[in-house]
Amino acid sequence: MDELKPDVLQVHDLGMSMTYMVSKWARKRNIRCVLIQGTYNTTLKPGLKQLECLFNRTFGKAVIKNVNAIGAKTKAAAAYVQKYYNKDVSITPVGLDESKFVGCSTQSDFRKRYGLENQVILLYVGVMEQRRNPLFLLDLMKAMPDHFSLVLVGEGPLFAQVKDKVKKDSIHNVVILGKRKQEELPAIYAASDLFLLASSYEIFGMVIMESMYFGTPVISTSTAGADTLIDESNGKVIDGLDVNAWKKSILQIAEDQKLLSEMKKRCQYYIANNLIWDKASDNFEKLYFA
């Protein structure tokens, strides 16, 4: 790195050995160094939990001493740092790169193509894996009225199990699209009424931002990204995976067209005015050049 002669260095996460080494290198050379924290929960794995806490209180102490400023992707990540050290932490959520959607149309015959013209569309986009709880979404759909349909976009370790459960349990109101190209997503987001994210852990959750950007309110479990991006005016955060609680929240929003319309507008406004990169980068610049 000596050859690069950086003006500012950004390191990630308190508990990383690379973070310690780079921040130490920067301090020796009087180079401004900024820590950005994403992790917000201590690991639950036996043994590793104690090791993580020990690292954070030893090498982590050196990291805090070495860096000039601290940012966190979410409020939960900020609290994680402050659990160990009484330091100022700025909230620096990542931004949405609009350029990847340039030329992508939000207009399509998506509803007609899949026979969903008169349906309330609930959408999930992401990896079919354990921490995202796609099987819970299927249990939820068994409790929803017939005019609600769930569209699943993505593949992953649980993909086959999801397909098997839909068939075995005769869940007729689910459309499984599998993996889709990036340019197809805007039309799918725009055609949907609500986005569902039942994750047990999300450092941020880019799909939340993408969905809100295209005007689709998100109902999510309480994870770091959801708690930072969503409030009662633009979506809903629910503690836990209780089918009745999720059903109640979905019905309250989806069956009130005025409320749903207002939420859609607030979603788009919030992302466009705060979290596209042109806006979000302001928070990082304040840390870099303070």
Positions of predicted regions on the chain:
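Nucleotide-activated donor-binding/catalytic signature segment of Leloir-type glycosyltransferases, i.e.
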Residues: 163-180
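Short alpha-helical donor nucleotide-sugar binding micro-motif in glycosyltransferases
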Residues: 179-180, 187-192
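Nucleotide-sugar donor phosphate/pyrophosphate-binding loop at the beta->alpha transition
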Residues: 32, 41-62
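Aromatic "clamp/platform" in nucleotide-sugar-dependent glycosyltransferases that forms part
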Residues: 200
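Conserved acidic donor-binding segment of nucleotide-sugar-dependent glycosyltransferases
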Residues: 231-232, 236-243, 252-258
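Conserved donor-binding/catalytic core segment of Leloir-type glycosyltransferases
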Residues: 116-141
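Short hydrophobic beta-strand element within catalytic cores of glycosyltransferases
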Residues: 217-220
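Carbohydrate-associated surface elements
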Residues: 76, 95
